[in-house]
């Protein structure tokens, strides 16, 4: 169970709380002393022995500008400070693969994040190898790569390393193929025109929502829908 979580934005915290109602979600900027101290105090009170840290990746993601001066890159400092204050048994550090090649400024020097982590925490922790992990190799129906660094406190005998890859690949069809079919919501045309193209839209939507509120139609422009309709199963456009 996740005992304590921190989120900057209220709407995201509310969504997280809906999924994990028993978690104490602390809302606010971890860079602010009052928020940081609240996290530390509650963590110590709850005797936290495992920390998951995933600092925002926009400053290093290939989908973003990869701005070296992006202040979000420096949130790794707060993660390190929390770890040093709590000293949990295990730490799970996750981010985009570019984390392994991203520099942060420390003592007026540019230093790679993995090197920085080790310089700050090697006194207390053993590190797993800096691995790029693909979720598809662990029964997740998504081809998604991430940098995963696992830390084990030095007083523990068991060293935490990534598990062996699963032999079977799970496809999206394997995972959700049993759910009711949905038609897309085409938002760049009048709704009447949309219903002419997808006359079963509302009937299928009602059936899907009766099973899960999360099973609702994706929103697309008509051009995208036409391309996807003509894209064979198992292929990408």
Model features per residue range: what roles?
Residues 9, 31, 56, 96-97:
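Anionic group-transfer/hydrolysis microenvironments
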Residues 40-45, 57-237:
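Class I S-adenosyl-L-methionine
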